[in-house]
UniProtKB/Swiss-Prot annotation:
Pfam families: RecR_C (PF21175), RecR_HhH (PF21176), RecR_ZnF (PF02132), Toprim_4 (PF13662)
GO molecular function: DNA binding; zinc ion binding
Native source species: Streptococcus uberis (strain ATCC BAA-854 / 0140J)
Gene expressing this chain: recR
Annotated TM spans: none
GO biological process: DNA recombination; DNA repair
Function: May play a role in DNA repair. It seems to be involved in an RecBC-independent recombinational process of DNA repair. It may act with RecF and RecO.
Family annotation (InterPro entries): DNA_Rcmb_RecR, Rcmb_RecR, Rcmb_RecR_Znf, TOPRIM_dom, TOPRIM_RecR
Domain Toprim positions: 80-175
Zinc fingers (C4-type), renumbered ranges: 57-72
UniProt name for this protein: Recombination protein RecR
UniProt entry keywords in alphabetical sequence: DNA damage, DNA recombination, DNA repair, Metal-binding, Zinc, Zinc-finger
Protein family: Belongs to the RecR family.
Length: 198
């Protein structure tokens, strides 16, 4: 069915979001049209504010509204550990369990030979720079249990082992192919407690 141009454009915009197909985009567009002007203005204002005010922490790469982020500036955290994750959503998932008290490093992607993504295409150089002259004795690799997650963890292990840094991987309480951000808190807690050395 053909929709008026403003609705068609809104549907197109929603459909560009990950996991949103045409049916859901259409539903969201019509829902948005039915919202009050005040709610639509608030929604638009919040979208723009998030886009303009958020940045990536210059230390760990986490999404933040202050640089460095509140995690990197927290002196009570364990300076001997860095937990490496794919993206900022994974930091939030780990923070929810309130059991990990070290620092983080966000890669903003994974090594993916099949997709032409190599180590230089993700945030790995800053991790290596951070580890020079630091008190870090263990790096916990918390990438998803996928082929790309495994490739990334093995690469990190190969690079860091010669420097004498212990490299561990989350235990396999996480199902192969699962995303960390969707795991429940107990599963994440068990995965951290039972991590394995690479």
């Amino acid at each position: 069915m053909l929709y008026p141009t403003p609705i068609a454009k809104l549907i197109d915009s929603y459909s560009k979001l990950p996991g949103i197909g045409i049916k859901t985009a259409t539903r969201l567009a019509f829902y948005t049209i039915g919202m009050s002007d005040e709610d639509v203005n608030d929604f638009a204002k919040n979208l723009l504010a998030a886009k303009r005010e958020l940045t990536y922490c210059s230390v760990c790469g986490n999404l933040t509204d202050e640089d460095p982020c509140s995690i990197c500036t927290d002196p009570s955290r364990d300076k001997s550990m860095i937990l490496v994750v794919e993206d900022s959503k994974d930091v939030s998932a780990m923070e929810k369990i309130q059991e990990y008290h070290g620092y983080y490093h966000v890669l903003h992607g994974l090594i993916s030979p099949m997709n032409g993504v190599g180590p230089d295409d993700i945030n790995l150089k800053t991790l290596i720079t951070r580890l020079m002259d630091s008190d870090v004795s263990e790096v916990i690799v918390a990438t998803n249990a996928t082929a790309d997650g495994e490739a990334t963890s093995m690469y990190i292990s190969r690079v860091l082992k010669p420097a004498g840094i212990k490299v561990t991987r989350l235990a396999r309480g996480l199902a192969v192919g699962s995303d960390i951000e969707y795991a429940d808190e107990v599963t994440l807690l068990r995965a951290i407690e039972n991590r394995t050395e690479l």
